[in-house]
Amino acid sequence: MSRGYPENNNFLNNNNQMVLDMILYPLIGIPQTINWETVARLVPGLTPKECVKRFDELKSCGSSPVDNQYNPLMATGEGPVETLATYIKSSLLDTQGDFQETPVDQDTVSKAGRHSIATTRNCSSESENCTARNAGEETGESEGPNMVIHVCDEAKSLKEDFICPRDLLISEMKYFAEYLSMDAQRWEEVDISVHCDVHIFNWLIKYVKRNTKESKDCEIPALEPGNVISILISSEFLKMDSLVEQCIQYCHKNMNAIVAAPCNMNCINANLLTRIADLFTHNEIDDLKDKKDKFRSKLFCKKIERLFDPEYSNPDSRNNAATLYRCCLCKKLLTRETERRIPCIPGKINVDRHGNIIYIHIRDKTWDVHEYLNSLFEELKSWRDVYWRLWGTVNWLTCSRCYQAFLCIEFSHCQYHSEVVVYSSTVNSLNTVGTGIYPCCNQKVLRFDPTQLTKGCKVRDHMVVLHDQGENDDSPSCPPAKILDDLHKHKDVIAVPFLKDAVSDPGVGSCDEKGLEYEILLEPNTPWGSKTGELNAFLSLKNWTLQLKQQSLFSEEEEYTTGSEVTEDEVGDEEEIAKKQRKKEKPKKFTKPPKKQLSSPCSQKKEKTLEKSTSRDVSPFVVSMQKNKWDASRSLRFNQDAQREDDQRRMSEITGHLIKMRLGDLDRVKAKESKEFAGGIYSRLEAQVRASVPVTARQNSSDKNQRSKSRFGQGRPA
């Protein structure tokens, strides 16, 4: 050991280095090229660069430094040594001469890494011997060079090295494909370090080598409830697609055992959670026995997200919530599919060209779906209940009793009367042949009701007969039978109690005639009927359709006019025409009304409806001529100026409307504020500041402003 190599004492203490010296010593003096890749495979843990370096040291020395120390081991006979030398010369020499020694400039393998390889191999000798034997003999040329992976387990303070052929590592763990280049000169420059649980990575390496020859001696690993989550996360990071799919399928089949095992499921990312949730039906998630709620709420949250995905074909729901909104009239939550089936208030009923009744809902712009979900969670305290309530909101069925489509949340809202309607056979002062009375609540009803709205004083559960419904073609993946079954299973969460709302259900529980005024039922003081309340059904229906036409035209005028033009409802009345003529005769200057008054059609609508209630049926329905028409009695310049002003006004209105469409929060802010400010938020803040200032201070400031204005007016030349 004292032949001029004191720095190599530690180097020779390792058995691997002693084996390397025994392999390299017979190669000294041979002129043929040495295949250093094959030499490195014989000694696990060493690179071709280290073998070249050690070979140069042995050539400069002239003799092996292990002769004296290991001569007793070789003194038994010359046969093994000669056999080893013969094998080395035959297998390690490159007879073709194609491979040349490549100089390596960078030292990429640290000494700490080599020390870790040696120590961990001593701890797990059985598995490493199996790996080293197969890596050196069987995987030689077919699977590429062996790659050493340093695994650091900080939680257990363990370090271990694993060896795997490069080609097999790239094909199974695609994460390393971008780091392990196909260039042979860079194979020895790569140092792989993985921070992972040692046992989990050992499981992964065994899975990678499951189809190799060495797997015959090693046991093929199996998934367990205690390790499947860790393996799933690690395999997803290493891009082991086949193993990820196996883990997801295992989680679907054994979720009850997994949630009962002591494992952390918070590390599952959104992508894996979505793939797992897609395998579950909502009934399977509901049946999970998750006492600590480690995973069930997350699955229900993913199901809620899927309900809002318009491109996802949901096997649990026939409709999605992507177009969910609230009607500002009937206050019902509707989608694009349910809005044409669920009735609104009687004033928004229309008839299509085929004679079918259609419902027109108006979207409530102040309603926000995120606030709705948060309020549902605050009310129900569980994402499971939130999902079932939302599922019942977007799905519908048809009742075989009332023949009306209903939302699943309104399952217990089937209105009916406990007694049969009684129609009078004789005409008297209180009734006509076309009307009847329910004795249970004294509610009056038409014999032929064109609205086809269900009305009753009591409610019960809807009855659904599946063979009577023609809805099986709407969603083949989720038939009505499945929806009805899910509705019965979770009725306590889905169904909401019935509320006697005067807007949506005015006929329920009301015994007076005011609750029945739908513009189609009884109106006691109608001008065309008798004073005692006699009703003509045909005239009532005619009046109702005329009113709908007027309302539609009125709504269009509200939306596209500023209020300065003459409305169509004011022309048919002779009193209004006389008033306008008197106004024209008065020598008053024309002043344009402010926009603040023009932008409040609600008050105008109330006043106009009061005026129309007494005169809408006396005079015919006439559409008025607008003021912005060309006036032949005026001069050309006047008409051109008027047209230019009208175009400017119209463009300003279009600009304002586009701004409101772009800033959708404007309507929400206006709805929350009791007072509107034309100047926007700055005007509102100024009003708040002025309201907070004492009255005396405001009076003093106003006096000062008036004095300053008067002085400024005096100093200005006339």
Curated annotation (Swiss-Prot):
Return the Pfam families for the record. BTB_SANBR
**Positions of the region Disordered?**
555-622, 690-718
The residue ranges flagged as biased composition, category Basic and acidic residues, are: 604-615
Q: Which residues cross the membrane?
A: none
> InterPro entries this protein is in?
SANBR-like (IPR045902), SANBR_BTB (IPR021777), SANT/Myb (IPR001005), SKP1/BTB/POZ_sf (IPR011333)
Q: Which residues form the SANT domain?
A: 21-59
Q: Gene3D superfamilies this protein is in?
A: Potassium Channel Kv1.1, Chain A
A biological process term (GO) from this entry: isotype switching
Domain BTB: start-end pairs: 147-255
Listed Acidic residues bias regions: 555-576
Q: Name one GO molecular function term.
A: identical protein binding
Give the compositionally biased regions (Basic residues). Answer: 580-595
Q: Subunit structure, per the record?
A: Homodimer. Interacts (via the BTB domain) with HDAC1 and NCOR2.
Let me see what the UniProt entry remarks about domains.
The BTB domain is important for homodimerization and for its function in negative regulation of class switch recombination.
Entry's family note: Belongs to the KIAA1841 family.
Q: What does this protein do?
A: Negatively regulates class switch recombination or isotype switching in splenic B-cells.
Name of the protein in question: SANT and BTB domain regulator of class switch recombination
Name the gene.
Answer: Sanbr
